[in-house]
C-alpha cells in the first residue's frame, strides 16, 4: 500500500503488525497484535477527523484510490459499454453504457484516469476531448429516449487543454452538455469520486443531485493552478486550498453539494467494497425519490437549484 506523508505514523504501526503476523503465533504475539491494532484504529480516527483541506486533496489523488472502472462492477450489473460520438471518434477518457442498479436499467457514464502508465495514456489521465463530451451527451439523450435515469461519475484533473481539442470545439462541447443536461427529462445523479476539476467535471456534472465521496474535491481550478495564478508558484498549493472551499463538507455547507457519501476509515482505497456499497445505497435512494416526481417537478427543482448558485448579499 502507498502512504501519504501525513500517514507516516500509521505506516509504522501497520508495518509492525505485518511483521508480527509472519511470526509463529502464540499468546504474546497475538496480544501484541491486538494492542497495535487498537493503537492504529485510535491513531487513524484522530488523524482523519482533523484533516486539512490539502490532505483531503492528497487523498482524492491517492494512487490506490478506486477509479470508475474499479467501482463499476461493484455497483452495477449487466454493464454493456457503448462507444463513440458518431461524429469524430471514441474518447476513452470517458466510459459509458447500459447497466442495472438493483435490477433497474440505468445509463452510467464515468471518467477514467487509468491505473498504470499504459492505461493512463490509453485513458488520457481522465482528461476528456470534445468527442468524449459528445459521446456522453449521446448516451444521455439515448437514456432520455428510453426513459432511463442517468448516473455520472466525476474524476478528472480537467478537460484536455490541447490544441487539437480546442480545434474540435472543446468549449462548445462542454457548454452544450451544460445546456442539455439541465433540461434532460430523466433523473440525473452525479457523483464526484476523486478530483472534480473545472469545466472538465461540469461537462458531465449537471443534474438533479450532486453527491461527493467524503475525501474528494470539486473546484473551478486545481489548487496548483490557483497558486500559480495568485503566487506565481504551484508550491503554495497547500496554502490556497484552505481558502478555496473545495472539500465535500464545505461544499455541503454552501449547498453546492447535496450529499456527502462516507468513506471507510482511512479513505476509499482501503476498502473498495464498502465504498461501492455506500455509493450504491446513496444513488439508489436518490433515484427512488427522483423517480416518484413528474418530469415537470424534477426539471423545476433542477432549474431552481442551478439558479441559486452564485447568489450573494451585499453587507
From Swiss-Prot:
Domain of life: Bacteria
Pathway per the UniProt entry: Lipid metabolism; malonyl-CoA biosynthesis; malonyl-CoA from acetyl-CoA: step 1/1
One Pfam family named in its UniProt record: ACCA
Subcellular location: Cytoplasm
A GO term for molecular function: carboxyl- or carbamoyltransferase activity
Enzyme Commission number: 2.1.3.15
Keywords: ATP-binding, Cytoplasm, Fatty acid biosynthesis, Fatty acid metabolism, Lipid biosynthesis, Lipid metabolism, Nucleotide-binding, Transferase
Domain CoA carboxyltransferase C-terminal intervals: 35-289
InterPro entries attached to this UniProt entry: Acetyl_CoA_COase_a_su, ClpP/crotonase-like_dom_sf, COA_CT_C
GO cellular component: acetyl-CoA carboxylase complex
Major site of localization recorded for this protein: cytoplasm
A GO biological-process term: fatty acid biosynthetic process
Annotated PROSITE patterns: COA_CT_CTER
Enzyme class per UniProt: transferase
Coiled-coil ranges from the UniProt annotation: none
Catalysed reactions listed for this entry: N(6)-carboxybiotinyl-L-lysyl-[protein] + acetyl-CoA = N(6)-biotinyl-L-lysyl-[protein] + malonyl-CoA
Recorded family membership: Belongs to the AccA family.
Function field: Component of the acetyl coenzyme A carboxylase (ACC) complex. First, biotin carboxylase catalyzes the carboxylation of biotin on its carrier protein (BCCP) and then the CO(2) group is transferred by the carboxyltransferase to acetyl-CoA to form malonyl-CoA.
Description of how the protein assembles with itself and partners: Acetyl-CoA carboxylase is a heterohexamer composed of biotin carboxyl carrier protein (AccB), biotin carboxylase (AccC) and two subunits each of ACCase subunit alpha (AccA) and ACCase subunit beta (AccD).
Designated name of the protein: Acetyl-coenzyme A carboxylase carboxyl transferase subunit alpha
Amino acid at each position: 500500500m502507498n502512504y501519504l506523508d501525513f500517514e507516516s505514523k500509521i505506516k509504522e504501526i501497520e508495518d509492525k503488525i505485518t511483521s508480527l503476523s509472519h511470526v509463529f503465533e502464540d499468546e504474546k504475539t497475538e496480544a501484541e497484535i491486538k494492542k497495535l491494532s487498537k493503537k492504529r484504529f485510535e491513531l487513524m480516527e484522530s488523524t482523519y477527523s482533523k484533516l486539512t483541506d490539502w490532505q483531503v486533496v492528497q487523498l482524492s489523488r491517492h494512487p490506490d484510490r478506486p477509479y470508475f472502472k474499479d467501482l463499476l462492477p461493484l455497483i452495477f450489473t449487466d454493464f454493456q459499454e457503448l462507444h463513440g460520438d458518431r461524429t469524430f471518434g471514441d474518447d476513452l477518457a470517458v466510459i459509458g453504457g447500459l447497466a442495472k442498479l438493483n435490477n433497474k436499467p440505468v445509463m452510467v457514464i464515468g471518467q477514467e484516469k487509468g491505473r498504470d502508465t499504459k492505461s493512463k495514456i490509453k485513458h488520457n489521465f481522465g482528461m476528456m476531448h470534445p468527442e468524449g463530451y459528445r459521446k456522453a451527451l449521446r448516451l444521455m439523450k439515448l437514456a432520455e429516449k428510453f426513459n432511463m435515469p442517468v448516473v455520472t461519475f466525476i474524476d478528472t484533473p480537467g478537460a484536455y487543454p490541447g490544441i487539437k481539442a480546442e480545434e474540435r470545439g472543446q468549449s462548445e462541447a462542454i457548454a452544450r452538455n451544460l445546456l442539455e443536461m439541465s433540461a434532460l427529462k430523466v433523473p440525473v445523479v452525479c457523483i464526484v469520486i476523486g478530483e472534480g476539476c473545472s469545466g472538465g467535471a461540469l461537462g458531465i456534472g449537471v443534474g438533479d443531485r450532486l453527491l461527493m465521496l467524503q475525501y474528494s474535491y470539486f473546484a473551478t481550478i486545481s489548487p496548483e493552478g490557483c497558486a500559480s495564478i495568485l503566487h506565481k508558484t504551484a508550491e503554495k498549493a497547500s496554502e490556497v486550498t484552505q481558502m478555496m472551499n473545495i472539500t465535500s463538507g464545505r461544499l455541503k455547507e454552501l449547498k453546492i453539494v447535496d450529499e456527502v457519501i462516507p468513506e471507510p476509515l482511512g479513505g476509499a482505497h482501503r476498502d473498495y467494497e464498502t465504498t461501492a456499497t455506500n455509493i450504491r445505497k446513496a444513488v439508489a435512494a436518490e433515484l427512488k425519490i427522483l423517480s416518484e416526481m413528474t418530469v415537470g417537478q424534477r426539471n423545476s427543482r433542477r432549474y431552481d437549484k442551478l439558479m441559486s448558485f452564485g447568489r450573494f448579499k451585499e453587507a
